């Protein structure tokens, strides 16, 4: 047993959680910068920044779908690999890693081909108008070239975190994000490439991150090694990954469906300005929830490892602390959106109309997100413990069962504001339900551990 993963079961819990969560939070924050920095620069392009920002916002469902497939393979396999490390079965952990990598390559080919062929009708379906389609198409056409890099960088980085190497995982993201921040103004403004320049900067940055991740996993520094032999897909391994990966996949892919529903509703009841406001709201949503997800992803290996080792008291203590920290995080970050929305909104646009509208709807939209940390912590606990069915139900609850129907029904009675109010209603109901399911499920799992 390597001392780096052994400490997951023996190091002082508070210090261990901090050492793993902090780099993971930093990595997630940095990762958000890929798309958010693009939007910040794009929104300030002279002459057409407002239309360009709306157009790029329309591509969000495609970007989310690409990330969802990386989560399917990465987050579906990494907890399983961590559990195997806890059982001191390195060979099985490496087999899971290799099959995940094989899936990521396969997904990249399929996604690139599909969206390249059907991008125009898809973008119109996602809320693009004749005034914004050119910017949406310019951005996504180039972004799709780098799908393989996004898949590998995001999906395989979970295996670096899963073996307790949170700092290495953070560097994987940091390298690409810093490069993206530097290249964006160069390609957008200096080389006058506009929206296309933002996409080129993102692709190049993700490529560097992907190379870094793969290089680490094939090296002797990695507790579990990535090999070509293990990339040959095996039915039993894929079934295991799919069982656990379907939940994070649904969590992310349904974000695309949510965005489509919201954008089409806003286009119908409001127009381009309202779609533009949603682009900003989605970006701020990432700024609030991604750091919390970073906390849960950093702590996840502790739960999975100790679950595999049968250390129930350590599992219980870890989950309690994770819930408290996540709730505190969303209360603070969402509080800014509720009480001082101009702080977030001003980052993305200087258009007076868009500023006023977004500042008006942001406090309403983020009311429920203030307690969403509970949902994030519980969801990660289900995944970490291998509770695939429960995790799947929770993933479906908030978005498919609650949010999408509410976003369709409420504007019929409340007008365009009904779309914004659907989010907090769905969030509160989902958090309450998840909390009840968590208490029942965890008691049963710990009793049988």
Regions found by a protein language model. Name each.
Residues 19-38, 142, 176, 205-209, ...:
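Transmembrane helical elements of multi-pass membrane transporters/channels
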Residues 143-161, 169-177, 198-211, 293-297, ...:
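Short runs within selected transmembrane alpha-helices of multi-pass transporters and secretion channels
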Residues 29, 33-54, 123-130, 186-193, ...:
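Helix-terminus/linker motif at the lipid-water interface of multi-pass membrane proteins
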Residues 28-32, 68, 108, 112, ...:
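Residue-level hotspots within the lipid-embedded alpha helices of multi-pass solute transporters
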Residues 8-48, 61-76, 80, 84, ...:
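N-terminal transmembrane alpha-helices
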Residues 53-113, 150-169, 277-341, 372-391:
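Small-residue-rich hydrophobic transmembrane alpha-helices
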